[in-house]
Amino acid sequence: MEEFISKDVKSNLTKLGLYQIFGGSVGILIIIWAIYTSPLLTGLTVLVYLFILLFYAYSIFCGTLCLKTKKNALGHSVTNQILQVIGFAIMGFAFNYVSGLYLTIGLDLTDSIKLDFGAGISKFDFNLNNEKDRLEVDFNLVAFAVIFWINKLMKKVKEEAIIIQTSSIGKT
């Protein structure tokens, strides 16, 4: 990708990369703090923490790809953001992953219909067979915005690649 991107695209890739590395790093620090302050660490708890660390490591991986302007950087970054768009809890299972900033709007249907808002930096909620009465869904508006930004970048990269390729036709 390096050979056919403008300074503007490279600047945006750098910003996206730093954002994802920042979010992943904050998430890892939160997990380390949770492990350090946990009163009881069982094998299952450690396994869950390692599972969560994989998500934040993936965010750092995506950011690194962006900084190195790798061809698959934007594809991986979209995947990373899609994982962050929707958080939910239903029948004892909950999943809510955010690496970076979040601004959420959600519905809590546990006891009644309640509109929720949230904001912060990096979070992870994972429950398996726990809080079975909990029923909620959250939408991360920041992740939506980042996906939109990445899609614009993808289009711009494709356009620039086509311009470079067509301008090189006939040159030898």
Predicted regions and their residues:
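Topology signature of small-to-medium multi-pass alpha-helical membrane proteins
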Residues: M1-T172
